[in-house]
Regions:
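Beta-strand-turn-beta hairpins that frame and shape the catalytic cleft
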Residues: 101-110, 194-198, 208-253, 344, ...
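N-terminal Lys/Arg-rich, disordered targeting/topogenic segments
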Residues: 1-13, 41
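Membrane-embedded segments
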Residues: 93-219
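Active-site metal-binding loops of divalent metal-dependent hydrolases
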Residues: 114, 149, 231, 294-295, ...
Length: 372
């Protein structure tokens, strides 16, 4: 009986030692994700992959913190310090802001990836298309930026530009993937505005179906710049891999896993090139600027980090909760964002998770210019 009792503490000690041996590299790895995200000095695609794993590393650090609090409190200091050092990054994923009252009527900006507007499945989605069109036209916003917006001059249901112009007389449209469409149709980035657009320019990124659209808009006595962008899509479909695992088809699951890693690698490389162009536009802007769109990357990624060096993020400054924007697997991510320059103050930011017409949710930010 005594021997059995003596073995139990030994077993517990061995388990505790193994967990501690796991805690040490975990904390070092988490610190590495911080270093890469703080400095942004390493531009290799592997750095992008490491940065993307930051929230998971922080979660594991939190679990280890709880464990050590109840096992050996002194050891809990290490994960606690690591989490404290990364507190600023936690704010990228969760916010607790409340709407700010303003004497000035804020300018409302919507951004929404509209998923091609069901252009490839019109017969099955007629009702959904009409509901989507009414929503994007009737929602009360001053400026609306859409990604994957579709228009076709020979299909009445897709006379979407003229439909939107009923309430938004000013617009700019840059078609993307022109080689995939005939002369009567186009899909790409569009900005609709209640206020005059005095300048527009845009570009499809090299080797990509994505791009940016820059517009200069005159509101009252002020000229403002709005950039609508969509970065390279990673093309990740996690549900394919998880379904293979559920079916115990581990060979195909491994193939899907390798495909995900390959897509991430390509995406990080392309995002670096694309964000170099976007950042140059931001730096050269003579006007207060708002940048919106589909980053196809999480807040711990390189693209988010590099734009955040130059602009504030609307979710962090005025949002609440987690702000997840993806309406498909893996769901619990935020890849659609709005950013603004120092001349602006964000007074409210929302993700409209009740609007489910697309595989993304719309984001809506409200802004006032300082001194107004």
């Amino acid at each position: 009986m005594a021997k059995r009792n003596s073995k139990a503490p030994l077993k517990k000690k061995i388990i505790s030692s193994l967990i501690w041996l796991g805690t040490l590299p975990l904390c070092l790895y988490t610190l590495l994700t911080y270093l890469l995200s703080y400095s942004l000095i390493v531009e290799h695609w592997v750095a992008g992959f490491i940065m993307m794993t930051m929230p998971y590393a922080q979660l594991l650090c939190f679990i280890s913190l709880i464990y050590w609090i109840f096992q050996r409190a002194k050891r809990a200091l290490l994960p606690l310090i690591v989490l404290a050092l990364g507190y600023g990054f936690i704010g990228r994923s969760i916010s607790f802001n409340q709407p700010v009252a303003s004497l000035t009527k804020p300018m409302t900006v919507m951004s929404y990836n509209v998923f091609g507007m069901y252009s490839n499945e019109y017969e099955a989605k007629k009702e959904s298309l009409e509901e989507l069109k009414k929503f994007i036209r009737d929602y009360d916003a001053d400026i609306k930026c859409f990604q994957e917006f579709y228009s076709h001059s020979d299909r009445k249901a897709f006379h979407t530009v003229s439909f939107m112009k009923e309430k938004y007389p000013h617009y700019a449209f840059i078609p993307l993937k022109k080689q995939l469409f005939d002369s009567h149709e186009k899909m790409g980035l569009v900005v609709f505005s209640k206020y005059p657009i005095i300048h527009e320019e845009g570009e499809q990124f090299e080797n990509s179906a994505n791009g940016y659209l820059l517009t200069d808009i005159v509101k009252d006595q002020d000229t403002i710049r709005v950039i609508n962008m969509q970065l390279w899509s990673m093309g990740i479909r996690v549900n394919k891999m998880t379904s293979k695992i559920r079916l115990q088809d581990y060979t195909d699951a491994q193939k899907e896993g390798r495909g995900i890693i390959s897509s991430l690698r390509k995406g990080f490389i392309e995002h670096k090139k694309e964000m170099d162009k976007i950042n140059r536009l931001i730096q050269k802007s003579p006007y207060p600027i708002i940048v919106v769109g589909d980053l196809n990357e999480t807040p711990s990624g390189w693209a988010y980090g590099t734009i955040r060096e130059r602009l504030k993020n609307s979710f962090e400054e005025a949002g609440s909760g987690f702000g997840f924007t993806l309406n498909r697997s893996p769901y619990l991510v935020r890849i659609d964002d709005q950013f603004f320059s120092k001349e602006w103050k964000a007074v409210n930011f929302q993700t409209l998770r009740n609007i489910k017409y697309s595989d993304h949710f719309p984001t809506v930010g409200q802004y006032i210019l300082h001194g107004k």
